[in-house]
């Protein structure tokens, strides 16, 4: 099975109205949703880390492709590292932001700011590869500890959590609603149940 021969990666782009890539992020995915309706959505990823070796050259062919086709706007590219030949295979290109796109904002690069600067203020920007180490997780740390199969990735995610560099876009400190807090507690409990019951 494809699932057993490598690792999944998320690559995000913002391409300007001048058809130039302004921002790239490249993150390794550690976990995905396990319920049938959520398959394909990641629940944990780590930016600035790659257990197969972090190399800026990985994204260069994708950058050239996006500019060659004259792409404009947001894009998310799903990739698979194939350990049989050491190459990254493109699975699909989504012409939008992803559910997990918040990790760019957490790393200091707000995608909407790029859009506004480009379309409203006509700002030209050099291409930036976001290297900031940041983890995005929708699941509690106990799920990360138990179900991330890659030891290097698991250790990196937990290290970032300890350093305060793991974010959950569903959690907002200023939202002190008891109803909201209960919802998030139940969501964590449900994630624990799902990962225990369902196989990926």
Where are these regions (language model features)?
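Conserved protein kinase catalytic/activation segment
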Residues: 86-89
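Peripheral (often C-terminal) accessory segments that flank ATP-dependent C-N-forming ligase machineries
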Residues: 117-200
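A short glycine-rich, hydrophobically flanked beta-strand micro-motif that places a catalytic Asp/Glu
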Residues: 72-84
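Residues in well-ordered beta-strands of folded domains
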Residues: 1, 12, 80, 137-138
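ATP-dependent carboxylate/phosphate-activation module, predominantly the ATP-grasp catalytic core
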Residues: 1-70, 94-119
């Amino acid at each position: 099975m494809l699932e057993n021969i490598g690792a999944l990666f998320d690559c995000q782009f913002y391409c300007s109205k001048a058809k130039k890539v302004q921002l790239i992020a490249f993150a390794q995915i550690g976990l995905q949703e396990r319920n049938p309706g959520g398959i394909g959505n990641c629940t944990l990823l780590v930016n600035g880390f790659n257990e197969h070796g972090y190399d800026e050259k990985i994204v260069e062919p994708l950058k050239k492709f996006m500019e060659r086709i004259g792409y404009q706007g947001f894009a998310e590219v799903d990739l698979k590292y194939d350990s049989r030949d050491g190459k990254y295979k493109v699975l699909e290109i989504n012409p939008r932001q992803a559910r997990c796109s918040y990790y760019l904002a957490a790393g200091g690069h707000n995608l909407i700011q790029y859009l506004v600067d480009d379309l409203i203020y006509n700002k030209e920007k050099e291409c930036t590869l976001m290297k900031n180490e940041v983890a995005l997780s929708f699941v509690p740390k106990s799920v990360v500890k138990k179900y991330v199969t890659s030891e290097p990735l698991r250790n990196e995610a937990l290290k970032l959590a300890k350093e305060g560099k793991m974010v959950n876009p569903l959690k907002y400190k200023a939202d002190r609603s008891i109803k909201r807090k209960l919802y998030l507690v139940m969501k964590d409990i449900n994630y624990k149940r799902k990962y225990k019951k369902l196989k990926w």
